[in-house]
């Protein structure tokens, strides 16, 4: 019905993905390294806090490549594993 709206979002999504690929390339980050870092970061944070949906991204900001982590903390206390 509103295909023109969908196309606009697809264009923006494609642009965002291209910017991300270029940032990875400029920072010389090997494939899979960001995913491994994301998993490690979330594992450490989840030891101390319950978390919701999170995102870890790399962005190009001028001459710098920036790692952005958005990790919302849930209200419920974390489940501690007994040793």
Curated annotation (Swiss-Prot):
Presence of keyword Cell division: yes
GO annotation, biological process: cell division; regulation of division septum assembly
SS bond partners: none
Record keywords: Cell cycle, Cell division
Keyword Amino-acid biosynthesis belongs to the record: no
Matches recorded under NCBIfam families: minE
Protein role: Prevents the cell division inhibition by proteins MinC and MinD at internal division sites while permitting inhibition at polar sites. This ensures cell division at the proper site by restricting the formation of a division septum at the midpoint of the long axis of the cell.
Family annotation (HAMAP family): MinE
Family membership noted in the UniProt record: Belongs to the MinE family.
Name of this chain's protein: Cell division topological specificity factor
Organism (species): Deinococcus deserti (strain DSM 17065 / CIP 109153 / LMG 22923 / VCD115)
